[in-house]
Amino acid sequence: LRERCGAEVVWVKHENHTPTGAFKLRGGLIYAERLRRERPYVRGIVSATRGNHGQSLAWAGRRYGIAVTVVVPHGNSTEKNAAMRAFGARVIEHGDDFEMAREEAVRLAASEELEFAPSYAPDLVKGVATYSLELFRAAPLLNALYVPIGLGSGICGAILVRDLLGLSTEIIGVQAAGAAAYARSFEEGRVVALNRAETHADGVAVRQPDAEAFAIIRAGASRIVTVSDDAIAAAIRAYWTDTHNLVEGAGAAPLAALLAERDRMAGKRIGLVVTGGNIDLALFRSWVLREPQAAVS
């Protein structure tokens, strides 16, 4: 992998090996523990998700005895839906994308007297920040760390830990080109929402940035790189070939960005965050195994 990237060293933070297969579990545990401790009378929680956030809440809710409802958009990953149900969550399909699912989750919170659990919140950032702390403590001083951006908890945690440790590491956000709301916002210096988020990498398929997350990203990230779905698929294949790890689209996006900036990062010490490995078999076959066809004149 180091040779492929042309870097002096590449450190990969493998969050695909947590009990739920993704980094989100760290935040879910912090959120559920505090809720059970401070508000034990809560009837249950409801949230919107494309999968990993919902799995984290379901797993943590089962551990702390909290009923969990998750709302997913129609067409969501069938395997992530099955995993959430296996962890004990009630799964409801609603709307065409994450934002529509979130609106339904807010409605359910009011109608069923449930606690609405946002996908970006201080407890979630505190929890997921621990993976950055582990990486920065284990790795040599990194010149740059590439982090995918969905709603922003992971990169915000990385920025906060970097600053608390007094490190000079560049934090570089990565988004899919078809769902580049944060990249667009970063360029314009204000929150910019998109009409659609089109990418096979469901973990970064967000069209409405969170204002609090954007403020942290704008102040602490060096830049945001966008990568095509073809580049993400190539990065998934590279991880499998080079490390024998199965990585989902969002988790492979940082490697895709590093490969796109190979010349710029030559000879440097680079960190990559594999945020998860939860990719449907059908999507893996139809997207990742289908290499782009060369143009024919």
Give names to the regions the model predicted.
Residues L1-S297:
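PLP-dependent amino-acid enzyme catalytic core
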